[in-house]
Curated annotation (Swiss-Prot):
GO terms for cellular component: cytosol. GO terms for molecular function: alpha-1,4-glucan glucosyltransferase (ADP-glucose donor) activity; alpha-1,4-glucan glucosyltransferase (UDP-glucose donor) activity. This is Glycogen synthase. Keywords: Glycogen biosynthesis, Glycosyltransferase, Transferase. Synthesizes alpha-1,4-glucan chains using ADP-glucose. It catalyses: [(1->4)-alpha-D-glucosyl](n) + ADP-alpha-D-glucose = [(1->4)-alpha-D-glucosyl](n+1) + ADP + H(+). It comes from Yersinia enterocolitica serotype O:8 / biotype 1B (strain NCTC 13174 / 8081). InterPro entries: Glyco_trans_1, GS/SS, Starch_synth_cat_dom. Pathway: Glycan biosynthesis; glycogen biosynthesis. The lineage of its organism: Bacteria, Pseudomonadati, Pseudomonadota, Gammaproteobacteria, Enterobacterales. NCBIfam families: glgA, PRK00654.1-2. Its EC number is 2.4.1.21.
Length: 476
């Protein structure tokens, strides 16, 4: 089966979030299952530098001007790059300028991505033609609309990684990006007078997937649906909405082989994990002690991630005898609040603003608990990394967090299924109660080690997800 993934990021070449991790791992896992899989991406500078050896497939006139489609390989995966320097050759983020303003021509930049995917399905490359086009998030949503407009030359799957990002643009652009005027309606891609690239994917795809079973249920409800819940309820009733849990790329995230760590370890040699803890405490300016558990945050600093709750719960966490290590960037108010906390609680709170892939490995390996108190979380990868590294996740019961972490309640400790700490209500008091339960387990080292070893033995590899997606493709 020939499958084309259409997306805007690819780990490790270009990453702004978990989307890049997924697309960096899923195609390889599907190839291992016997599929013929390629990826299409905009020709952003980081991607072109990372895939320098490409050949010209075709030059073609488009609504965005003359464009070249190039083909190369990255880590054994066939990659199509759309070479359109006027659209994509910009430094920094692929989505916004240095002032964090979204590029005014994003509607054109990402319409071209969907348009080129459709052209490939129509035979643009005479040597390879996809049977399934798998589009990811709003950036690729129009691929499904273009395929529908062209009579569906390939089947389409649209994966929602985060429904909150919808790709909304003026309806005046519809003619320019060469989509039928008839598509601009409620039963189409129109959303409150605008074009929604996300809705285009949801409406026109043959099947919609999300990145966890619980999130697939949540987004059919007004609290999580961002206005799309009616359409998603319809897709669910039609059997066209599925939640498939993301996986962890064990080639990158494995404490036994991770060369970014100060000391590699496994479930039977957890003393070496303590070496990473000491290095983390030193690096973050924390008191060096084995007695205090380190609670870590590795995240975008946004309200969605529930990090305002962490700030509210911080005095209790420290009073109980914990430390906090934070790595992330995002909302300026949250950044300043965490930096102020580091100044107020010197030696007990360490904060590094920004995102550094290597340091994210070291902080997850060195910490004892990874905090993921999200208001909503489509899947979440950080808690999966925590499980793999024996850094017990403390999470809110939502989305993929609910699907992957089992609370250390007495009955779960008794039957050996416990893998972390889970709370339900979205408030600081509930978070503090979960933190207190973490300290109770911490005070019983034998039980803590037992839960660590169980967590590290859980299998969240990509093989299961890859097989599930291929099974879905065959049913289309």
């Amino acid at each position: 089966m020939r499958v084309l993934h259409v997306c805007s990021e690819l780990f490790p070449l270009l990453k702004t979030g978990g989307l890049a991790d997924v697309v960096g791992a899923l195609p390889a896992a599907q190839i291992a299952e016997g599929a013929d899989v390629r990826v299409m991406l905009p020709g952003f500078p980081d991607l072109r530098r990372g895939i320098p050896d490409t050949v010209l497939v075709r030059e073609i006139d488009t609504f965005a001007g003359r464009v070249s489609l190039r083909y190369g390989h990255y880590q054994g995966i066939g990659i199509y790059l759309i070479d359109a320097p006027g659209l994509y050759d910009r430094a920094g983020s692929p989505y916004h300028d240095q002032s964090l303003h979204a590029y005014a021509d994003n509607y054109r930049r990402f319409a071209l991505l969907g348009w080129m995917a459709c052209e490939l399905a129509c035979g643009l490359d005479g040597y390879w033609r996809p049977e399934v086009v798998h589009a990811h998030d709003w950036h690729a949503g129009l691929a499904c609309a273009y395929l529908a407009a062209r009579g569906r030359p390939a089947r389409s799957v649209f994966t929602v990684h985060n429904l909150a990002y919808q790709g909304l643009f003026s309806g005046h652009h519809l003619a320019e990006i060469q989509l039928p005027a008839a598509f601009f309606q409620m039963y189409g891609l129109e959303f409150y007078g605008q074009i929604s690239y996300l809705k285009a994917g949801l409406f026109f795809a043959d099947h919609v997937t999300t990145v966890s079973p619980t999130y697939a249920k949540e987004i059919t409800q007004p609290a999580f649906g961002y206005g799309m819940e009616g359409l998603l309820q319809e897709r669910a009733s039609q059997g066209r909405l599925t939640g498939i849990l993301n996986g962890v790329d064990s080639d990158i995230w494995d404490p036994q082989t991770d060369t970014l760590l100060h000391a590699r370890y496994d479930a039977e040699d957890l003393q070496k994990k303590a070496v990473n803890k000491t290095h983390l405490q030193t690096t973050m300016g924390l008191e060096v002690t084995e007695k205090k558990p380190i609670f870590a945050v590795v995240s975008r600093l946004t309200e969605q991630k529930g990090l305002d709750l962490v700030l509210e719960a911080l005095p209790d966490l420290l009073q109980l005898g914990g430390q906090l290590a934070v790595l992330g960037a995002g909302d300026a108010i949250l950044q300043e609040a965490f930096l102020a906390a580091a100044a107020d609680y010197s030696g007990q709170v360490g904060v590094q603003i920004g995102y550094h892939e290597a340091f994210s490995h070291r902080i997850i390996a060195g910490a004892d608990v990874i905090l993921v108190p999200s208001r909503f979380e489509p899947c979440g990868l950080t808690q999966l990394y925590g499980l793999k590294y024996g850094t017990l996740p403390l999470v809110r019961h939502t989305g993929g967090l609910a699907d992957t972490v089992v609370d250390c309640a007495l009955e779960n400790l008794a039957d050996g299924s416990a893998s972390g700490f889970v709370f339900d209500e979205c408030d600081a008091q509930a978070l503090v109660r979960a933190i207190r339960r973490a300290f109770v387990l911490w005070s019983r080292p034998k039980h803590w080690r037992h839960v660590q070893r169980h967590a590290m033995g859980l299998d969240f590899g990509w093989q299961v997800a890859a097989a599930d997606y291929l099974s879905l493709y065959r049913r289309l």
